[in-house]
Swiss-Prot record:
Function: E2 conjugating enzyme required for the cytoplasm to vacuole transport (Cvt) and autophagy. Required for selective autophagic degradation of the nucleus (nucleophagy) as well as for mitophagy which contributes to regulate mitochondrial quantity and quality by eliminating the mitochondria to a basal level to fulfill cellular energy requirements and preventing excess ROS production. Responsible for the E2-like covalent binding of phosphatidylethanolamine to the C-terminal Gly of ATG8.
Complexes and interactors: Monomer. Interacts with ATG8 through an intermediate thioester bond through the C-terminal Gly of ATG8. Also interacts with the 40 amino acid C-terminal region of the E1-like ATG7 enzyme. Also interacts with the ATG12-ATG5 conjugate.
Active site: 251 (glycyl thioester intermediate)
Any one cellular-component term (Gene Ontology): phagophore assembly site
Protein name: Autophagy-related protein 3
Chain spans, region Flexible region: 86-182
GO molecular function annotation: Atg8-family ligase activity
Organism encoding this protein: Pichia angusta
Length: 339
């Protein structure tokens, strides 16, 4: 753990000493300027309003960013499953032999992981229902739940309860608030600009089901083991006052983005070739004028030249998908309900 704190100190010093570059090199390097970071943040907030720009305390402001756009934040992002639980499920899936003799791959293991998450959610719902029912034990609560004789809902109108809000308030007042599933955690997520790597940088601050801040070791439980000792650092969030966070080191972000851009460009070019072959084939069948199809090639180049290319303002949306692989139990999809 001492090594992580030393790395944090070195990282902070490097951020302070690195000069700011305003020259755009995104398409060549995958890096972005502060201005491009702001544009990407505006796009993220527009598409997914659960993310918001935030100012920083006066002493923490960075003069190369607008005062009201110092960092991005989304709060109360749920996490029901620890990273180790995901990894255990994935290993089990890889070991299972299918009927035709081949072994499940990482891609195929997504389904059981999602099921595991749904199981945890159902557990959370049952836990709350049983606790609020006044059951003295989970077993008693489950028996009450199963024996309640609730009828099947056949009409959407049956889901509407005009007194539900009042009932919830009354229950909360009588019980001192809803009791949460002890396995559930919530995270506040922050994205700021890294001057040393010229890419976004993610910070996470976690809380348990009672709202108590998680320790660094507890937050590490939500980091995939492959990244835990390589790309994750414990440090004080430099844009907040005395807040311990876990940061995801941005050293590979630019390279990942560059690879993704190459793949997107290759896919766009392959699609263009397929489309051209299709037009040519149709022309040979007499359903189109082959000469006109050839003449339209230049027009297609103008209109489709940027098709499939990742735009710089889309950076943070892609960035979050990369970060999700580092913290598989944190439900980033929750922050993208507006999509």
């Amino acid at each position: 753990m001492t090594g992580l704190y030393l790395r944090s100190t070195f990282s902070s010093l490097r951020e302070y000493l690195t000069p700011i570059s305003h020259k755009s090199t995104f398409t060549d390097t995958g890096e972005i300027t502060p201005e491009e970071f702001v544009a990407a943040g505006d796009y993220l907030v527009y598409k997914f309003p659960t993310w918001q720009w935030s100012p920083a305390p006066e002493s923490k402001k960075r003069d190369f960013l607008p005062n009201d756009k110092q960092f991005l934040v989304t709060r109360h992002v749920p996490s029901y499953v620890r990273a180790a639980d995901y990894e255990h499920t994935e290993k089990e899936a890889e070991m299972m032999e299918e009927e035709d003799g081949w072994t499940s791959t990482n891609v195929d293991s997504v389904a059981p992981q999602r099921c595991n998450t749904e199981d945890e959610r159902r557990h959370s719902i049952k836990y709350i229902e049983m606790t609020e029912s006044g059951a003295s034990s989970p077993e008693e609560g489950l028996a009450q739940h199963e024996g309640s004789g609730k009828h099947e809902i056949n009409d959407i109108d049956e889901l509407i309860d005009e007194t539900a809000e009042e009932s919830d308030l009354a229950n909360d007042a009588g019980q001192g608030g809803i009791i949460n599933d002890p396995k559930k955690r919530n995270y506040d997520l922050y994205i700021t600009y890294s001057t040393s790597y010229r890419v976004p940088k993610m910070y996470l601050v976690g809380f348990n089901s009672n709202g108590v801040p998680l320790s660094p070791n507890e937050m590490f439980e939500d980091i995939a083991s492959d990244y835990r000792q390589k790309t994750v650092t414990i440090e004080k969030a430099p844009f907040l006052s005395n807040t311990t966070s876990v940061s995801i080191h941005p050293c590979r972000h630019a390279n990942v983005m560059r690879v993704l851009m190459k793949r997107a460009a290759h896919a766009a070019q392959a699609k263009k070739i397929r489309d051209k072959d299709l037009v040519t084939g149709v022309a040979k069948l007499g359903l189109a004028d082959g000469k006109n199809a050839d003449e339209e090639d230049d027009w297609e180049n103008v209109e489709q030249g940027e098709e499939g290319i990742i735009r710089v303002d889309q950076y943070l949306v892609i960035f979050l998908k990369f970060i999700a692989s580092v913290t598989p139990g944190i439900e980033y999809d929750y922050t993208m309900d507006a999509f």
